[in-house]
């Protein structure tokens, strides 16, 4: 298991990753490697045909001062593509009103392969094409992404 957290409030632009900048629980097996701020490499190094991981994302998010109050969302991305089932949406009633999101995805990596995993601010208004998404959100410090090998 490995866990990475943010140490300060972050302004994250639409379709960008959350910068996890501190290792809370290090991975001692070499299966999870941070390669960039907010991007993790997960390895499928195993004697089996695959390695399976549970990736959990949690944190508090809000529309920053000066932003438009719309639905905001975070999702888990694998190799840059957001997993639709992992998108967690929060609809604030006012600017700077924080809401907690928690989501997870199960990711299967074939033996000998790797995948990049990240948490991304995505459009929470895509069900309403007439609404323009907020260009950026605030992600409160102590947001975390946890990677746990389950098979």
Model regions: which residues?
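Extracellular jelly-roll beta-sandwich "head" domains, especially the C-terminal globular C1q domain
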Residues: 1-151
